[in-house]
């Protein structure tokens, strides 16, 4: 079977057929050069929807509502605000989220159950619900507004994060696209910060949820900036079927290509989040192979990527690779140190548990790259995984010390 997956140079969340978006400044966050803080993603036709949400016990109101509405069919829209998380706001916050969904549904002439919702921003503050209800009705929807949607969901992000791919499989074509936000409080578990995926492919609901979970497990669930999991983490996917392909379901050749394309989209967005970590200068990729199993490989990769000592060493271009081994050793997975190989880029610093004597000045120079790849081979089994993080700088401390002041 012939197939191709191509990343489009100017793709956005509205690249798939039938999707529109719009954004406006509603006064939720302080005025800035990016004067957008309220957005809608919309499909011309009803969608099959899937979602994955935060495992943080301190969940925000919009998470509960979206999880509930995903239980219905025909979801068609997602309303998103930035600047206020609507978490830690009690019954009043839940009422505000419900009002936000109702106002959006009325403006789009649909039922509230058809609308999903997401919020991001400062915890513990009420939404300015009157401003939101007034402005959500003014949002103009267009296929051209995908980039505006990606900008409107940003908080401390320094750049928008979006991608679209075109997939061709033996005579038919479809698109998968995505937008995400996140730069701090990034340590997801079964979710991401905020992520939105669209496709015009026809997909069964069961397979869509399965495929999204599979893609998240090798992308959003493998990134870390600071070890904190948000109260609002949500990942949504909408499929409107306008590509009119044979419906993807189960383990078929077609569905495997769909899964591959979805994984490309999710990994691209996840790496963009890690690369844009608050105050970060470098993207760190941890590659673990030779683990006893997949779970051990993922565990070790995530612990190394999240280690403050590893992150600060990379920031300072300090080739103190003992920190990498120490992080791997505390991950809780079994391995034999006398079998371990460790590479910084292509340079072996440890082979079969013994130091190789690579010149540290050369390593320090290499660590100044914008993308740093660390490879650990346990030489024990077939387990293999990758995780992504970023360096930890003084700027991260400054951003978060002054976040609300």
From Swiss-Prot:
Pfam family, one: ArgJ
Site (Involved in the stabilization of negative charge on the oxyanion by the formation of the oxyanion hole): 120-121
Site (Cleavage): 191-192
Pathway in which the depicted protein is active: Amino-acid biosynthesis; L-arginine biosynthesis; L-ornithine and N-acetyl-L-glutamate from L-glutamate and N(2)-acetyl-L-ornithine (cyclic): step 1/1; Amino-acid biosynthesis; L-arginine biosynthesis; N(2)-acetyl-L-ornithine from L-glutamate: step 1/4
Molecular function per GO: glutamate N-acetyltransferase activity; L-glutamate N-acetyltransferase activity
Signal sequence segment: none
Active site (UniProt): 192
Gene3D superfamilies: ArgJ beta chain, C-terminal domain, L-amino peptidase D-ALA esterase/amidase
SUPFAM superfamilies linked: DmpA/ArgJ-like
InterPro entries: Arg_biosynth_ArgJ, ArgJ-like_dom_sf, ArgJ_beta_C
A Gene Ontology BP annotation from the UniProt entry: ornithine biosynthetic process
Swiss-Prot/TrEMBL catalytic activity: N(2)-acetyl-L-ornithine + L-glutamate = N-acetyl-L-glutamate + L-ornithine; L-glutamate + acetyl-CoA = N-acetyl-L-glutamate + CoA + H(+)
Compartment list: Cytoplasm
GO cellular component: cytoplasm
Enzyme kind, highest EC tier: transferase
EC number, as in UniProt: 2.3.1.35, 2.3.1.1
Binding site for substrate: 155, 181, 192, 278, 400, 405
Key words, A-Z: Acyltransferase, Amino-acid biosynthesis, Arginine biosynthesis, Autocatalytic cleavage, Cytoplasm, Multifunctional enzyme, Transferase
Entry's family note: Belongs to the ArgJ family.
Subunit structure as annotated in this protein's UniProt entry: Heterotetramer of two alpha and two beta chains.
Function as written in the Swiss-Prot or TrEMBL entry: Catalyzes two activities which are involved in the cyclic version of arginine biosynthesis: the synthesis of N-acetylglutamate from glutamate and acetyl-CoA as the acetyl donor, and of ornithine by transacetylation between N(2)-acetylornithine and glutamate.
Xref: PANTHER family: ARGININE BIOSYNTHESIS BIFUNCTIONAL PROTEIN ARGJ (PTHR23100), ARGININE BIOSYNTHESIS BIFUNCTIONAL PROTEIN ARGJ, MITOCHONDRIAL (PTHR23100:SF0)
Name of the protein in its database record: Arginine biosynthesis bifunctional protein ArgJ
Gene label: argJ
């Amino acid at each position: 079977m012939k197939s191709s997956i191509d990343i489009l140079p100017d793709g956005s969340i509205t690249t798939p057929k039938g999707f529109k978006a719009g954004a406006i400044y509603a006064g939720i966050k302080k005025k800035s050069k990016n004067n957008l803080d309220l957005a809608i993603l919309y499909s011309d036709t009803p969608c099959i929807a899937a979602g994955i949400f935060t495992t943080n016990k301190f969940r925000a109101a919009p998470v509960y509502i979206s999880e509930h509405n995903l239980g219905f069919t025909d979801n068609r829209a997602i309303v998103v605000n930035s600047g206020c998380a609507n978490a830690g706001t009690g019954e009043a916050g839940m009422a505000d989220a419900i009002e936000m969904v109702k106002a959006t549904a009325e403006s789009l002439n649909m039922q509230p159950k058809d609308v999903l919702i997401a919020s991001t921003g400062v915890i513990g503050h009420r939404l300015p619900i009157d401003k939101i209800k007034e402005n959500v009705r003014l949002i103009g929807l267009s296929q051209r507004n995908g980039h505006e949607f990606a900008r409107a969901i940003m908080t401390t992000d320094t750049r928008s994060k979006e991608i679209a791919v075109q997939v061709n499989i033996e005579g038919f074509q479809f698109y998968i696209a995505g937008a995400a936000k996140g730069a701090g409080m990034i340590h997801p578990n079964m979710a991401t910060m905020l992520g939105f995926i669209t496709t015009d492919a026809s997909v069964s609901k069961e397979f869509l949820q399965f495929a999204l979970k599979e893609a998240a497990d090798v992308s959003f669930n493998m990134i870390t900036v600071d070890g904190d999991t948000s109260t609002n983490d949500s990942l949504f996917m909408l499929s409107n079927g306008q590509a009119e392909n044979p419906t993807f379901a189960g383990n078929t050749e077609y569905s495997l290509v769909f899964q591959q394309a979805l994984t490309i989209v999710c990994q691209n967005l996840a790496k963009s989040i890690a690369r844009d970590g608050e105050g970060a200068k470098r993207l760190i990729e941890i590659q673990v192979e030779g683990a006893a199993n997949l779970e051990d490989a993922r565990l070790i990769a995530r612990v190394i990527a999240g280690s403050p000592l590893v992150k600060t060493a990379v920031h300072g271009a300090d080739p103190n690779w003992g920190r990498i081994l120490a992080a791997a050793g505390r991950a809780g997975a079994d391995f034999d140190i006398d079998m371990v190989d460790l590479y910084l880029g292509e340079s072996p610093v440890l082979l079969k548990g013994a130091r190789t004597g690579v010149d540290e000045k050369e390593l320090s120079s290499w660590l100044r790259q914008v993308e740093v790849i660390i490879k650990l081979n346990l030489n024990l089994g077939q387990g293999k995984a990758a995780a992504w993080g970023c360096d930890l700088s003084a700027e991260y401390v400054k951003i978060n010390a002054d976040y609300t002041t």
